[in-house]
Amino acid sequence: MIETLIAGLTCGIATFYGMGDGFHGQRTANGERFDAYRWTAAHPYLPMGSKIRVTNQDNGKQVIVRVNDRGPYSHADLDLSYSAFAHIESTHKGNATVCWRVVA
């Protein structure tokens, strides 16, 4: 994990979940059903419902996601839903160097 914090900006590695792994339709940590096609995220400690702007550091693409789950349970710092990750990086790559900031 490379998670670093600079003046409210956190950087690290993002991965995705919800496609082909059995999570789509399952309950998230806040009790709602996980939808791989909504822009959501799993984070270990940000408050549920927080909205964060995630920026891919390689291409500048951004997505705003809502934290609705806990995790990640991999080597990453942030787990994005399949759709949110696909908006900022090819899912074939599997991970991305990102920075994020709470916006709401």
What is the predicted function of each stretch?
Residues 2-104:
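Secreted/periplasmic proteins
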